[in-house]
Amino acid sequence: VDAHARNLVLFDIDGTLLRTEGVGVAAMLRAFSRLHGERGFSFEGVEIAGALDGLLFARMMAQHGLPADEATHAEFQKIYADELARALTPSVVRRMPGTVELVGALRDAGAAVGLLTGNYEHTAHLKITVAGFDRTHFPFGAFGADGPSRRHLTPVALERAAAYLGRAFDPARVTIIGDTPHDIDCAKAHGCRALGVGTGPYSPERLLAAGADLAVANLADLPGMRGWILG
């Protein structure tokens, strides 16, 4: 990555770069049961899309009157990573159209590329690796245990990008790409550009209504996406 990169691009993972079709959620529920025994753990009525893993953990613990201290959280993350690693095979991970090509094209053009995701760091890297992305193409990011809400993750990602590249980025040159209104919100709250993608549960129209600067069905139009992001 060019240390003089003018553009920073931060990708969400689930519903944006790839889909695991429920495997991640199932692995998380098994991890709760391994940690605390069968208690009927369920995400029924909980909006998973755009949620932070750390927040889902805290919510589940509170719901069942269980401790959510740091040691328990660390143990849960280990068990969840183990469950996910066993369940996640290339056959259950679907890469979204044009994503690998876009990441490569942005890097080739000298843009800095990172992650901004609700996934824990370890499981984020696990998902993108199994999906066939080069993990080294995302050398920094903000993850699901880095703050209490997605809006808190944006400054973390910007700080880590600055630390990695040795310079700060103008938020107007930062594009956050995601598939939920939470992704749009965490961009706009910090003066960044928001690119909504309809490969998750929300249509491009819904993402535009949430404040996206641009919303598309998918990222397959490589010249169009590259031009808009770097423009």
Segments and roles (model prediction):
Residues 2-49, 55-58, 62-63:
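Active-site neighborhood of HAD-like aspartate-dependent phosphohydrolases
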Residues 5, 10, 85-115:
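Short, acidic loop-to-helix structural element flanking the phosphoryl-transfer center
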Residues 99-131, 141-148:
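Substrate-recognition element of Asp-dependent hydrolases with the DxDx(T/V) motif
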Residues 153-184:
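Conserved Lys-Pro-Asp/Glu-containing loop-to-beta segment of HAD-superfamily phosphomonoesterases
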Residues 176-214:
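Acidic, Mg2+-coordinating phosphoryl-transfer loop and its flanking beta/alpha structural elements
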Residues 222-231:
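Short amphipathic alpha-helix with an adjacent loop that forms part of the alpha/beta core around
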